[in-house]
Structures are given as structure tokens and as C-alpha cells.
Amino acid sequence: MTLLNPYFGEFGGQYVPQILMPALKQLEEAFVSAQRDPEFQAEFIDLLKNYAGRPTALTLCRNLTAGTKTKLYLKREDLLHGGAHKTNQVLGQALLAKRMGKTEIIAETGAGQHGVASALACALLGLKCRIYMGAKDIERQSPNVFRMRLMGAEVIPVHSGSSTLKDACNEALRDWSGSYETAHYMLGTAAGPHPYPTIVREFQRMIGEETKAQMLEREGRLPDAVLACVGGGSNAIGMFADFIDDTSVGLIGVEPAGLGIETGQHGAPLKHGHVGIYFGMKAPMMQTSEGQIEESYSISAGLDFPSVGPQHAYLNSIGRAEYVSITDDEALDAFKALSRSEGIIPALESSHALAHALKMIRETPQKEQILVVNLSGRGDKDIFTVHDILKARGEI
């Protein structure tokens, strides 16, 4: 029996080998206890404020919406220590690991942002850290790999499968099944077996809470819609959670359409996948006709994931949130537009959400509306990728 509901509608659950059930039970018990412990909460809030730099700014775009009646705000998770929203929940999970008496952290990473966040939290709190990363992602995210190693983490390349995030997740789970007595698996997104989707949401929900308070202070009302990119979905559920009951606010999640949905080279399982069991949960996922997990694709390493968190699947199924997709090229255009118009270089992941916001504005330029894009991370890690693409196109 679980203490918390392991499902969101039909999605979620705990589809793991029996050997991991005691570890998940211990984790759930520690989380429930910590949520009720004022000392734990005070330490978490102190780290968020005085180490990570919360609250993050809500920035009104000055130039990007010129000639339209839209006010476009950016929730600046890119300003957080570590460079992305990932820092929020790893601090919470690292404190939970200490609470459970663990001495080691196992993590997986795609873009490297969760790896960097895990490494900094472990350095701060005195935990050993080993991070699994697809060999392909190590190539395209070398600055983040060096950051992790600089902070004392062991980065382990994964060469199996497509050598990306999916394979890193599998290796991390395999490691944990043999080491859970001393190690905590610090999952990087709001997916996987229960209680991870709930834990990650609760340790990210300050994004939406702050946004709501900042909007009321700045505009005296809530936004018409909030937008966030969706890979596994942690930054999006962090933004959405506090707005779910505010039905006047649209929730828009943006998946990667990659080279185009019709090519099959994408990472949009919510709208174009089938429900199955993967990574310890029941959720939509990209599958072959034989039912095997299909390789996902995105220009953005952090969105290159063949499934999605169960709460997003549920919000989609009941129509509370809308999920759309943006291609590599559209994300690149948004990346360039924000850099040139506002002097803010966004992560390629966040550029997907920004691209859809810009598409909405172009379609109804005279509509008076307030949109908030969760700028989940900064683009420093992506400048070499973008440079090579623009150079190949003759744009630079």
C-alpha cells in the first residue's frame, strides 16, 4: 500500500522489479514525513533563497511583441544557480537523501542540466555523485560534462541503444537496483515510478506559485495562459501545478516536433504516441508497430525523451491542459529572436515554449492577452550546437 495515490487517472503507478519496492516505499515515507516537518521545509526554503537565488524574476518582453497587443512575460528560471529549473528539485531530493541516511546519489541526465544540478547539490551537501549520460549527449553537451566533473561528480557514458537520455535512465535504474541501501536515485523529471512524479512536482511547484503572486502584483490579474516545454515535464508541471484550479488560465505544454511529426523524427508522445509501460510508469510513449520503445529525436537534448510524466498525460486526457508541438527550426527561430530582441539567450528546450507563444501572437496580433513562458533554462550550453547549424546554413 502506498501513502499517496500512485496514479493520475489511469496513468502512473509503480512498474518496477520487486527488488526496488522497499526503496520506493522508504522514499515515499521520507517524503511524506518531510512535507510535514517544519525544519525540513525551512532548510529547503533557505537553500532555494540563499543558495539558488529564488524567487526568480518575471520579465516583461520589451521588443519581441512590438506592434501587437500581447504582453509576454518570461519566468526566469534561467537565472537560477546552475542555469535551469533543475536546481529546485535536486536540492529537495538531496535533503531527502540525507534524511534517509544515504551517502551516494545516482542520476541520469540528457542536456546535462540535471547532471549539473545534481553535482552542485551533492558538492554542497557532502554526497557522492555518479551521473549516467548518453554518449551522444556527452558529445553535444561538453560544457556541462566538464561542470559536473569540476564539482566532483563521476560522469558515466552510456553507449547502449540510441546513447541518449532514455538509455541513461535505464542504466541509472539498473545501478540503483543493486545499490539502493546506500544510494538515492535522483530522478530528473516528473516521470518514472511513484512517488517520483509527485515528489518532483512538489519540489518544482514554487515556479507557478511565484508566477501567480508576481502576476497579481504586476497586472492585478492572472495570465490568459502559461506555456512550458515538455520532455518528461518537470518544468511544465512546476509552472502548471498552482494554476490547475484556475480554469481561466490556459495551460499549454509544448513537445518537440523535431524534424516534423510526419517524419517520425520527433519527441511528442503525448499527442502522437500510445499508452504503454516504460520507465516504471504507465504513460503515453513512442512505440514501434511491434510495441517496442521507439527512439525519440529533438535538437534539444533535454526534450529527447520517448515518454512523458503521468500527470501531463492525465491533464491532457481531461482537457485541462493543451499540448502542442514545435519543430527544431521553429525553436531555433525563437532562440535567435529572443537573443536579438531582448538580450536573453534561452535554452533550446525553453525555445520550444517561446516559439509557440510567438506563433499564438502572430496568429492574433490585435488580441489583448497576457502570456507567460517558463524560460526553464539558459542557452549557454547550446551555443555550440546553434553555431554549427547557423554556420552550415551560411547565416553566420
From Swiss-Prot:
GO CC, any one term: cytoplasm
**CC cofactor:** pyridoxal 5'-phosphate
Complex and partners? Tetramer of two alpha and two beta chains.
Output this protein's name: Tryptophan synthase beta chain
Similarity remark: Belongs to the TrpB family.
**Gene Ontology MF: a single term:** tryptophan synthase activity
Q: Which Gene3D superfamilies match?
A: 3.40.50.1100
- Look up the record and name the pathway of this protein: Amino-acid biosynthesis; L-tryptophan biosynthesis; L-tryptophan from chorismate: step 5/5
The chain residues annotated with the modification N6-(pyridoxal phosphate)lysine are 86
- What keywords sit in the KW lines? Amino-acid biosynthesis, Aromatic amino acid biosynthesis, Lyase, Pyridoxal phosphate, Tryptophan biosynthesis
